[in-house]
From Swiss-Prot:
SMART domains, per database record: Arg_tRNA_synt_N, DALR_1
Stated name of the protein: Arginine--tRNA ligase
Origin species: Stutzerimonas stutzeri (strain A1501) (Pseudomonas stutzeri)
Assigned keywords, A-Z: Aminoacyl-tRNA synthetase, ATP-binding, Cytoplasm, Ligase, Nucleotide-binding, Protein biosynthesis
Family annotation (Pfam families): Arg_tRNA_synt_N (PF03485), DALR_1 (PF05746), tRNA-synt_1d (PF00750)
Chaperone found in the keyword field: no
PANTHER family found in the cross-reference section: ARGININE--TRNA LIGASE, CYTOPLASMIC, ARGINYL-TRNA SYNTHETASE
Gene3D superfamilies: Arginyl tRNA synthetase N-terminal domain, HUPs, Isoleucyl-tRNA Synthetase, Domain 1
Disulfide bonds: none
Domain of life per record: Bacteria
Family: Belongs to the class-I aminoacyl-tRNA synthetase family.
Motif interval(s): 'HIGH' region: 127-137
NCBIfam families assigned: argS (TIGR00456)
Amino acid sequence: MKDSIRHLIQQALVRLTSEGVLPEGLTPAIQVENTKDKSHGDFASNIAMMLAKPAGMKPRELAEKLIAALPQDAQISKVEIAGPGFLNFFQNSDALAQRLETALADAQLAVHKASAKQRVVIDLSSPNLAKEMHVGHLRSTIIGDAVGRVLEFLGDEVIRQNHVGDWGTQFGMLLAYLEEKPAAAESELADLEQFYRAAKQRFDESPEFADRARELVVKLQAGDAQCLSLWTRFNDISLSHCQKIYDRLNVKLTPADVKGESAYNADLADIVEALREKGLLTEDNGAQCVFLDEFKNAEGNPLPVIVQKAGGGYLYATTDLAAMRYRSQQLHADRVLYFVDQRQALHFQMAFEVARRAGFVHEGMQLEHMGFGTMNGADGRPFKTRDGGTVKLIDLLDEAEQRAYTLVKGKNPELDEAELRQIARAVGISAVKYADLSKHRTSDYRFNFELMLSFEGNTAPYLLYAYTRVASVFRKLGKGIDEISGQIQLDAEQELALAAKLAQFGEVLNSVGEKGEPHLLCAYLYDLAGLFSSFYEHCPILGAEQEAQKQSRLRLAALTGRTLKQGLELLGLEPLERM
């Protein structure tokens, strides 16, 4: 609808320019926004205020001329001037009802991508396999997953890449411990964190063990068969731990999506050589660097991207450049989204620039760092255990499910144990995910079980319950959401408000896909649930006075239910038919 209004305004501008009211050569970015107060219409534009000065007119005077020049459109009932010169557009309720009918008849809810479809690589999760997944991995995993789901729904081809840390000096230490205690390894590897701590303790206390660890790193990097066998076994166990977490989080990551650091080992020397051939390398204290004039340190000197250490070893930047080249040349990506901590912003800005200069990525390929803030504890500091250690993700999910179980059992003591557990799992996991996804991606946030498990406010339990309310209407009716006949008619204020929000679903999803910000979808679903609650309270559905009105309201409820369910699923949450 916003695009339609922009087009109408553009036509009015062309007409006013041809009539000499506006000077030639104006190319304004026409802004159309949703209004918050529906007494001011459904959409507003500040175009008259933007162009008043070049037109040599007062904004309200230009606004009047724009309204007179606007073509007639069946979707718009009227246009008014507000305040200093805003144009307020009121939707035609019949045209709005027809748009909702189109959405109801479509499996995609009439949602289409506003721009051309693309092949998108999403770099997400990417834990270090030397340790167990902890809370720090949650944001990359679930934000990347939600954005990937939305892009797929919009029609993009999405390729997920789990760039796990499966290489590096720490693996020598782990392999030495695995070699030293093969019998105990199986049971100890069940707790990767404990295994890592035990290996680290041996490394710190025994010079002989430390020497053996360093020796094994060299052998591993040289491709020693026995070392590779031990390394593969360790990684397989670690990845199986990760996969259990992904399955539990309902995240669309599989073993086939793993493309770890080690996958690029054979390319690293070639990356350095390619940079040398392009004349981009400078030696600095024995290290091979690419200096970038656009990025300077506090003294005003260019910052380096180091791609090879003086001793010959490679760095994260080298691996990232190899991955960018692979994603361009082998995966033929149009767009690559990196869901990595905000603190890595400079690293990625510099790596992207080197990749472009070196020709590792094709012209027009979009490289975007989707940085995110930190999950903090109640004290506002990074979330830790009582003894200051990192919180294992599995422990967090266990506690969430147990708290949800206590909550659900208290509200529904009559439910059998199996259903209680199933509901508690969905509510607990959804609560953790939604508390994160509903915050702006770049914001830090405080983790709080009490708030996230509340049935009030912008929480997963509130939204899951909102969907069950819709489902209960159709259970009472004895019909499915997709079995309702009749036509939508919009009369009551609450019907119009709900309908206007339903019509915005596609626009919101396009914004999520473009910006990589799932909180926009969360805010939309929360508003939608609130508007449905008001509609449900003021507009009797099954008790409507006339049959046509009953069918219309059932159709509105059906579209609300389908939109809520689709939105929850795109966030990676599990809708429940009853709680």
